[in-house]
Amino acid sequence: AQTPGVTTVSFENNVYRSTYTGVGKAIDACLESKTKGGLQLVVLENRIPRLCINLPDTLTEAYRNGEINLTQVYQQMGITVDTDPAMKALKNAGQEEVPSAWKVDLVIYPDLFLENNTFDELYTYAINLNPAVEMALWKGGKMTAQVILPVATNLSGEMKRIRPGIIALSQDVRFRHNIFGKMTVGNFTNNRYGAQLEIKYRTNNGRWELGGTAGSTGFSAITREDGWYIGRKQRINASLNASYYEPRLNLQFD
């Protein structure tokens, strides 16, 4: 979208496993284009805006004139969680190209469990491979279907059986003023199934995050007698959380 002095673009990284690599490729492509003035790049995740990268016209012109390199552009560009102005500029933009909807990823998660809780054994262990199919649905919607394949363990019962992992449907939403929401239903980890709602707020610089979660879950397990057993008794859980990120030390405090 073109506004006086600024070109606004939204993009989603569907190619590179590293988000930073995808962002870098998008910035490089925009700087090599023939647009004039400043640039605004909205980073999307499953079509939900997450970040806005601002490159003023002085920065883009200095790069195109060979006065600074791409590394210096990264150091001087602005990054904010506030995407409201940029998304307003994109409201009447053309149809998106290569959307993420209905694209499927096959991901394999290695899983190692170690626990020392007995005197007659040094530890109990379990090594699993957890392949998962992850599909982006509509805007903010995602489906995950995972199976747990035991590789080696000295445990018994369910831990030796092929069993379902995370089988869930989630919906992300973004409200104005940096407020995010997520609703997830399905089969979770730690033998729990049910539903969970998350709400969080992030400051513009992304350092502070405040939020809360609430859910209702029941017991879920694979047993020899009942197959996939799903308990009816529900347990209500809720929590409040806060985190702070210190970029100079690359540390996050929860």
Locate each region found by the language model.
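Phosphate-interacting basic helix/loop segments used at nucleotide- and nucleic-acid interfaces
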Residues: 1, 179, 193
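Transmembrane beta-strand segments that form the barrel wall of outer-membrane beta-barrel proteins
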Residues: 106-118, 143-150, 176-188, 209-217, ...
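Feature captures outer-membrane beta-barrel proteins of Gram-negative bacteria and organelles
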Residues: 127-137, 162-175, 194-214, 236-246, ...
